[in-house]
Amino acid sequence: YNEFGWNYYPEAFGGQLLQWIRDKQVSVRTSMDLACGTGILCEILHHAGIQASGMDFSTGMIEIARKNNPQIHYDVADMITYRPEKQFDLVTCTGDALNHIMDIENVGRIFENVYAYLREGGWFIFDLLNEKEVPEEEPFDLDFSETVKAQFHVTQNSEGRIHLKTTVW
């Protein structure tokens, strides 16, 4: 994983995420990284004083994460059905992980589950990378609260793949 340079994205994103937390003065004491891979983002958050946790479907990835950061809690699980008992201030799912969920109902299940283990006022930050291969469709807005709004843009390409892009402000 790291030998191929795939650690670049979580390292770059981790720095940007910490800057966003500082700039927005967001209170983040606990975090969960879905599809955490080798745990790079968890490590970055842990070193920033956040009680970080991670999960991944790959036993091999979690073994590496545990070896590199034994002080961080990691689970081997499927993010479609994952429902930890603990709640978190921040849940992340980056590195194109949601693009691997091919059924829109399963994407919905992930969002429902995240909502269940996200503390009130918490943040779910994720990415979906594939904007060049999908046609444009009308986005829709959701108001989560008076201060937090999100725009979702759901598209389907010619192969039937579902894509979801979001902007939160």
State the predicted function of each range:
Residues 1-27:
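Conserved class I S-adenosyl-L-methionine
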Residues 31, 91:
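Receiver (REC) domain switch-region micro-motif
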Residues 32, 39-81:
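Class I SAM-dependent methyltransferase SAM/SAH-binding core
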Residues 83-90:
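A short acidic, Gly/Pro-enriched loop at the edge of an enzyme's catalytic core
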Residues 94-96:
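Residues lining the SAM
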Residues 99-101:
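A short His-aromatic
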Residues 108-120:
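A short glycine-rich, Lys/Arg-flanked "PGG" loop and its adjoining helix->strand segment in the class I
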Residues 125-169:
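SAM-dependent methyltransferase
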